Amino acid sequence: MIKFFLMVNKQGQTRLSKYYEHVEINKRTLLETEVIKSCLSRSNEQCSFIEYKDFKLIYRQYAALFIVVGVNDTENEMAIYEFIHNFVEVLDDYFSRVSELDIMFNLDKVHIILDEMVLNGCIVETNRARILAPLLILDKMSDS
């Protein structure tokens, strides 16, 4: 099960955070700081899976952005690693080569995409067309 999903830039600034288990606000800040430090300090040659406290971190870097997913011990690391790539491909489809600015200025749409893909910490959809369908309908409604 996915515990949290983070998008972070190289400077360590959180661009998106989504928690699927309750974590108090003051503990979230500490958790994010430690997780970000753990991922940013690693070299490209090191594995993208990290054992951290009572869960695993799986991360991928795309240009200046890192996507970090915290999961429980029973989750398949490779499945989450590919899920991260699928998420970025969906963002690329919607934004036509997504950038950090797209995420910052369209955070609501990024949350909709993530909510279409993950429900209560479980991956429920990976088909790009089905994931983007609600957003395309919203875009049509706002255009008219």
Curated annotation (Swiss-Prot):
Gene name in the database record: AP4S1
Protein family per UniProt: Belongs to the adaptor complexes small subunit family.
UniProt-listed InterPro entries: AP_complex_ssu (IPR016635), AP_mu_sigma_su (IPR022775), Longin-like_dom_sf (IPR011012)
Task of the protein: Component of the adaptor protein complex 4 (AP-4). Adaptor protein complexes are vesicle coat components involved both in vesicle formation and cargo selection. They control the vesicular transport of proteins in different trafficking pathways. AP-4 forms a non clathrin-associated coat on vesicles departing the trans-Golgi network (TGN) and may be involved in the targeting of proteins from the trans-Golgi network (TGN) to the endosomal-lysosomal system.
Membrane topology label: Peripheral membrane protein
Taxonomic classification: Eukaryota, Metazoa, Chordata, Craniata, Vertebrata
Gene Ontology terms: cellular component: AP-4 adaptor complex; Golgi apparatus; intracellular membrane-bounded organelle
Subunit structure: Adaptor protein complex 4 (AP-4) is a heterotetramer composed of two large adaptins (epsilon-type subunit AP4E1 and beta-type subunit AP4B1), a medium adaptin (mu-type subunit AP4M1) and a small adaptin (sigma-type AP4S1).
Originating species: Bos taurus (Bovine)
SUPFAM superfamilies: SNARE-like
GO biological process entries: protein transport; vesicle-mediated transport
Domain of life: Eukaryota
Keywords per UniProt: Golgi apparatus, Membrane, Protein transport, Transport
Localisation per UniProt entry: Golgi apparatus, trans-Golgi network membrane
The protein's name in its UniProt record: AP-4 complex subunit sigma-1
Main location (coarse class): Golgi
